[in-house]
Amino acid sequence: DVATLAHELGHAVHSMLASEHSIFTQNPSLPLAETASVFGEMLVTDRLLAGESDPLLRRELLVNALDDVYATVMRQAYFVLFEIQAHRAILEGKSPEGLNELYLQNLQEQFEDSLDLSDEFAYEWLTIPHIYSTPFYCYAYSFGQLLVLSLYRRYQHEGDAFKPGYIRLLSHGGSARPRQILSETDIDMNDPDFWQGGFEVIRGMIEELEGLGL
């Protein structure tokens, strides 16, 4: 669909801008690899919302966007929290059933009383390949999505003035550490206000969805 096209075109633009570097440093590091792709999806969602007055369709667009945010920011972060707990539990001699209990507690903490979770969900962690093949990998999804949301918040405030710095960010590819690349575009990874901007984008989508009253 159009969102997938925007996502993949984002990767293409990122690669083109970074192509001046050697083959060893063209590809962005994991935390920045999804920057242009997810940013492209955000642009498409905003454009569709701007041209849509039907409340039902607006709700669908917002729900899809928020689903993606949850799946990429919260869910992936909780995978890593579970991994930390699981590795400690294994060192303490916990059985597989004990790991299942930890995972179910992990889900219950996420959803509290908003969802009824059946006992079968305790086995879900067994279906997540990253846990076996690339341990502690999933943090990068959370980092990348929240980075894009925070960048998008800045774009909303700055408009055209945002573009040169963003292009400069993508042009680095993987030629430097993420902290250095971001600092050269006036982004301080240690600044809570920058990251809070991403949560403000989420808040805005939730408030609009609630305001539709459907």
PLM feature spans:
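Short, structured coil/loop segments at alpha-helix boundaries
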Residues: 1, 22, 53-58, 191-192, ...
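Non-transmembrane, amphipathic alpha-helical segments
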Residues: 1, 25, 65-66, 136, ...
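Post-HEXXH active-site segment of zinc metalloproteases
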Residues: 3-4, 15-38, 42
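C-terminal, non-catalytic "cap/extension" segments appended to globular domains
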Residues: 4-6, 13, 42, 50, ...
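Short, glycine/acidic-rich hinge or "gate" loops at secondary-structure transitions
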Residues: 21-28, 49-61, 158-165
